[in-house]
Amino acid sequence: MHVVLAGGGTAGHIEPALALADALRRQDPTVGITALGTERGLETRLVPERGYELALIPAVPLPRKPTPELITVPGRLRGTIKATEQILERTKADAVAGFGGYVALPAYLAAKRLGVPIVVHEANARPGLANKIGSRYAAQVAVSTPDSKLRNSRYIGIPLRRSIATLDRAAARPEARAMFGLDPNLPTLLVTGGSQGARRLNEVIQQVAPWLQQAGIQILHAVGPKNELPQVHQMPGMPPYIPVSYLDRMDLAYAAADMMLCRAGAMTVAELSAVGLPAAYVPLPIGNGEQRLNAQPVVKAGGGLLVDDAELTPEWLQQNVLPVLADPHRLYEMSRAAAEFGRRDADDLLVGMVYEAIAARARR
């Protein structure tokens, strides 16, 4: 059996695809896996690092809104579809599993032409254009939110890395806090804006850090590799404020934390919900508003807080986040609510949907 994955561009598309690849290999070590990508996407690094074949196709960005560039898309797309067809034929693909992004649409159209079963996974609450089109031709459609608008979809959550999906935060906490140089007993706030960091979150947390420390809160802050580390003048006897450029072990960062301040990308929301880590979500104020929609269900369930980017101030953190971190019972209740909302088994469920799609084709 050979499965072709189509989910390049950003980590939000690539990580669920790789989680599916890992789950397929756990069930059948002989399964062939090829990931489609473009030469400018993160997949050029992430896919080979995980040991999977990467096949490059020309990038055809899809404008979010009608623009003059939209006229050129069909012509450029034809060449990319042809290149994708050649990969599907070379690998003798039994299924295409798509996750959105630049490479997904040509993969769906090439698979439709060749009669290869399509499985679509949509991570965002508001589907992107590629997955809207792909879902029309798909044998199986999986979504990450219960109220998705994609037709004939099945709610499974988002496939996660095993280090996250199997994480026992309480058991890993002593190791995690020791690794980051944190106090083993103090309430801990984790702050990160994702792989690239978030300037506004960085600015606000640096302003409010002294107040949090005075209240007995320690902070682990990933500023992002493109941002300068702040100068820290640690006062004797004060809880630590530890800025780092990047967190290689997000599982241990989650284990070390009691609460998180972060953006609301679909993968972030899924991971925090799965491990039961409550968060103050600050949706990125661009795009089509999908980050707010991503966070709303878990916030409604009681597993987090939600604040607009423009409303995030030191005063808001003092009034809303500090009381949570200072109240162990409230932290426990929010953690439980997040965990009850989260899904840890989406990777295995999606494997089942891939097998169902292949079996349905065989019966025809």
From Swiss-Prot:
Its main location: membrane. CDD domains: GT28_MurG. Its EC number is 2.4.1.227. It is a peripheral membrane protein. GO terms for cellular component: plasma membrane. InterPro entries: GlcNAc_MurG, Glyco_trans_28_C, GlycoTrans_28_N. SUPFAM superfamilies: UDP-Glycosyltransferase/glycogen phosphorylase. It catalyses: di-trans,octa-cis-undecaprenyl diphospho-N-acetyl-alpha-D-muramoyl-L-alanyl-D-glutamyl-meso-2,6-diaminopimeloyl-D-alanyl-D-alanine + UDP-N-acetyl-alpha-D-glucosamine = di-trans,octa-cis-undecaprenyl diphospho-[N-acetyl-alpha-D-glucosaminyl-(1->4)]-N-acetyl-alpha-D-muramoyl-L-alanyl-D-glutamyl-meso-2,6-diaminopimeloyl-D-alanyl-D-alanine + UDP + H(+). HAMAP family: MurG (MF_00033). Cell wall formation. Catalyzes the transfer of a GlcNAc subunit on undecaprenyl-pyrophosphoryl-MurNAc-pentapeptide (lipid intermediate I) to form undecaprenyl-pyrophosphoryl-MurNAc-(pentapeptide)GlcNAc (lipid intermediate II). This is UDP-N-acetylglucosamine--N-acetylmuramyl-(pentapeptide) pyrophosphoryl-undecaprenol N-acetylglucosamine transferase. It comes from Streptomyces coelicolor (strain ATCC BAA-471 / A3(2) / M145).
